[in-house]
């Protein structure tokens, strides 16, 4: 019986209700207080008028005598503690008691000089009179009125999140500074016209120390042309590499937009339970003729890994093939068996009875995420030991993600995007988001980090990838001009030049002198602009491969091979990891891959090169293969749509997006290797196809496809165009076409 009572009282919801009932009872006791009721100071035979009875009469008299009106702080504290218990926000009992005592003593001291008929002593009670008389011996009464309100403010600060206060003060200071500067910038030039406030030509108002962007970059203000023929005060900050307008000062989103981690940490299995499960596992292995011993147990938030050392002569493939039989024998959802790199053991992973869920905020607040050596942090989740796993996209340098519907793939991609949004401003990192499904990435449409609105048409997706290739080539030319090898060196050199107030110039040969034959050089000034990282996110690769497979594969290959040093990285996802979507060329250029739960062993081998993904549990459970080809199991964090909506709304309010129209606009030139997917025909390519048909006397789609090295859809469009122009006939009953052009 006591066990069940203890179990009920340990529930946070039950504790909250009990605290609320106690607080309400104290309020009723204090509100129904009557000085004529029986108490410690008076004796009467009449029944007490207090609503709680004789207990309420004595309790109210005690509280009013000692604490006065400040007794209402006690039920207020009960209500606040009950709310915290309800939401699982536990704090130290010492801190809670200290806060209440500090509030009672400070408030009682402030009210000690007020006399009331209801309370014989004072409005602050006996405690207030004692503390006030003691302090007046050493401190002036005026200072006393300043010290104890400070204690009350300290109480309020202890009960409120410091992050909320700091964010409010930052926003308030930004707002006031901005409008004060606008006021002086508008009023002072007009006062100088009438001689009230003369301004010299070289007067400048330096606000560097008053207003700076709360991120790693600096902001340069651009001034509008004034209509007043006077010398206005110039409002400036030392120019750096990126420029944004004065009403679009971008900042990182506050951490308070993310949901707080709930206190739902599941109590793990005890050591005795783990040993018992290990013995059961050994028994099952012995039943199948596998001998060995378990040397270590690693309990994680979702699964528990048993390190099994097989006997000498036991093949690994034999143990791995028993995964389904072990899961059936132990009544487990699934079992994954894999070799642990660097150890002479096999890791047998069994799911826990209760799964631990954790949110993204818990991982963003870790030291691993704050590590500045990680240039492009991607929050992946927690490993088998429960430690945060933060990957660096700059070192990957590209990521391939696969998983079926409901496996947590979309939530994982959202966590990666949000982790980048919390690290970089729009001047430091930009995105190209391609979402043919028009569902997953549409929530980010309109944020200032985008180079173009979310691309949903496959034809524009090819153009966007083509633009990324051109941007990569342009960046390589810029880096070679100043003699650096990567984007980090380029930005460092630009920042160094800006700090020294100099420009970077480079002589370029433009020709030769016709008289002397010596080379002619011209000095070219480099554009002093910092290059941001560009992350290309493709949510569904299968749809793009269906429309223009060859062209997409070629562009992805070029970016994956060369774009790392230029600061362009790709995150590509698909829910159909088949060989026609994830081709050998793509796999060779994406060493870093993530596989969520898939349907079959074949899909697991396609994405990772080995089986195991089909044994995952779903809901964020994944296998991560870094660029070292080492596979580790990771459990992803949860980020809901409400959090994403808050973050995107904040970013939209702080800054407007600056789109580059060329990202999705078809260039005027004709490129024979571009299939825009809408049935249009390139005239140059069409003439080549007609020439091939005339010379070779072959008109099949596959032959034209091989000859021109284009996609099947484009070759079919060319043949249909020839049929309309009367070059070839329509296909007969066997599918062959007759060539109507005469031989050359």
Curated annotation (Swiss-Prot):
The GO molecular function terms of this record are: ATP binding; ATP hydrolysis activity; DNA binding
Any one annotated GO CC term:
plasma membrane
Q: Where does ATP bind?
A: 406-411
Keywords for this entry? ATP-binding, Cell cycle, Cell division, Cell inner membrane, Cell membrane, Chromosome partition, DNA-binding, Membrane, Nucleotide-binding, Transmembrane, Transmembrane helix
Is Cell inner membrane one of the keywords?
yes
Subcellular localization, as worded in the UniProt entry? Cell inner membrane
Cytoplasmic compartment segments? 200-744
**One GO biological process term:** chromosome segregation
Tell me where in this chain the FtsK domain is found.
Answer: 386-605
Can you quote the domain comment? Consists of an N-terminal domain, which is sufficient for the localization to the septal ring and is required for cell division, followed by a linker domain, and a C-terminal domain, which forms the translocation motor involved in chromosome segregation. The C-terminal domain can be further subdivided into alpha, beta and gamma subdomains. The alpha and beta subdomains multimerise to produce a hexameric ring, contain the nucleotide binding motif and form the DNA pump.
The UniProt subunit note reads as follows: Homohexamer. Forms a ring that surrounds DNA.
The entry's family comment says:
Belongs to the FtsK/SpoIIIE/SftA family.
Q: Which PANTHER family match?
A: DNA TRANSLOCASE FTSK, SPORULATION PROTEIN RELATED
Q: What is this protein called?
A: DNA translocase FtsK
| Origin species | Rickettsia prowazekii (strain Madrid E)
Q: Recall the taxonomic lineage recorded for the source organism.
A: Bacteria, Pseudomonadati, Pseudomonadota, Alphaproteobacteria, Rickettsiales
Query: What gene name does this entry carry?
Result: ftsK
